[in-house]
């Protein structure tokens, strides 16, 4: 079962997204801000995907994404935000996110995007495992 971290300061949306993901075979944990999300990440759970808002109290989504990228280059990050301007999208992708959805979101579309991100992450991971070089045969 895939572990998903949902970082969204709107409590109702956070609960709705987590409930929907849990009903669809994911294990979702909701956090209301980035600091709580950091605690969850350091708490030992290995998350497979992060969904984050941009506009949150304290640490915003851009700073959160940059910090996550510094710690883990491979975990997919999807922004789910009300910001629909190009500058925000650009900043998000430059911070290291993998996808961007504008609120209000369609939960079925969110699921499709998550599945695509997880599929690409699995492919990238399997390529790393299969590109191990064959050791040379040494004759003595």
Predicted regions span which residues?
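Short, Lys/Arg-enriched segments at the junction into DNA-binding effector domains
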Residues: 3, 116-140
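Two-component/phosphorelay signaling modules centered on CheY-like receiver
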Residues: 10-29
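Acidic, metal-coordinating helix/loop segments flanking the phosphotransfer/catalytic sites
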Residues: 30-49
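Receiver (REC) domain active-site loop signature in two-component systems and cognate sites
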Residues: 51, 56
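The feature encodes the CheY-like receiver
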Residues: 57, 85, 103
């Amino acid at each position: 079962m895939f572990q998903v971290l949902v970082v969204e300061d709107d409590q109702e949306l956070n609960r709705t997204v987590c409930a929907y993901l849990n009903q669809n075979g994911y294990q979702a944990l909701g956090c209301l801000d980035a600091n709580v999300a950091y605690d969850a990440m350091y708490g030992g759970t290995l998350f497979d995907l992060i969904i984050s808002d941009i506009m949150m109290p304290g640490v915003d989504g851009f700073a959160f994404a940059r910090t996550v990228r510094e710690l883990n280059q491979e975990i997919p990050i999807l922004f789910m935000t009300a910001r629909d301007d190009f500058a925000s999208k650009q900043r998000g992708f430059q911070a290291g996110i993998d996808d961007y959805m504008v609120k209000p979101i369609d939960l079925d579309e969110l699921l499709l995007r998550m599945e695509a991100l997880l599929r690409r992450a699995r492919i990238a991971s399997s390529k790393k495992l299969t590109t191990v070089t064959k050791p040379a045969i040494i004759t003595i």
